[in-house]
Amino acid sequence: MMPILLLSRLLPRLTRADEAEIHVVLSGIPHNVTTEMDLELWAIAQHIGPDVDDLTTRYLDRNLPADVLFGLDDFLARHGHRTAGEIDVGVPRWSEDPHQVLALVENYARTGGAGHDAARRFQQCAEEAQVMATEIVSRSPNRLHARFAAFLLDRVRQLAGMRELPKYCAVLGIAAARRHLRAIGTELAGTGQIANPDDVFFLDYEELSELIEGADHRGLIADRREVHERELRRKHLPRLLLSDGTEPETLLTVEKSDGALHGTSASTGTVTGVARVVRDPAKARLEPGDILVAPSTDPGWTPLFLTASGLVMEMGGPNSHGATVAREYGIPAVVGVPDATTRIVDGQTVTVHGSAGTVEF
């Protein structure tokens, strides 16, 4: 994030570039492993052909064109450690349950057949970014400022995408830990000490050691599963809590409604489309032009950005994952919109004003 923050601070002083222009420069960023992963899935989808039904079953039955099977196998071998909510060691990886990946590929195949070209759109964003960078540099008041601005723009575009790499590598470690823990869980489930191999993820290491030594933690596991499932159903997640449990946002004076939801500008531009409220990316079905409305996103969600025309997110700020990816894909985005997934109805037509940080419906 440091190169982007440096660009946002220095470029306006050097060239009088505004926020919208900086957002254009930050679109179509290269060297982003997550973006490359998304575009790879898109390319695979374009080889499936017109029949895209029951893709998961056909993949598991090996009933797909050879190049598609090879592409999916290779993708899962290299990126199968990823998933939505991937920093939780208890969440199954794509390699264990490829349904989410195959659902995305199926959706890509449908939208590609409808004339939508996500790869071309990303390339167009990169080209527009280069044009904007040249325009910004040309406005520099002197040669020294111009050289520094050009250097800054080039370095940021070359380096910003690498911000995903540390987490990508960290998740490799989490996935490896999951494999080992689940192997222990499988053995314990086989002896009847636990009901399910995944029960081990509801214990800490000390408790797991006790279980291996013969302790009975089935009641503890059941209690924690109940709490976990209850928390998964929670509709509202506070962005900030005080030490006494108070949520500061509930103490703020609520302004009269003007027919719009208010949040933080994350990616400039204005777009009108059909809202798709998504809480589980594995169950999402986005058509080209749809606006993604979500509680929050992580890299496991980013394949959805290839078909979305805008983003509304309940959590996060201008430098959150969803905001950054929206800028890279050149789609308007508003983040930090309280209760967006409940106040916006799936299928409703909404307008996202990325620059103003508002959503109208």
Which residues does each PLM region occupy?
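Contiguous hydrophobic, helix-prone segments at protein termini
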Residues: M1-S265
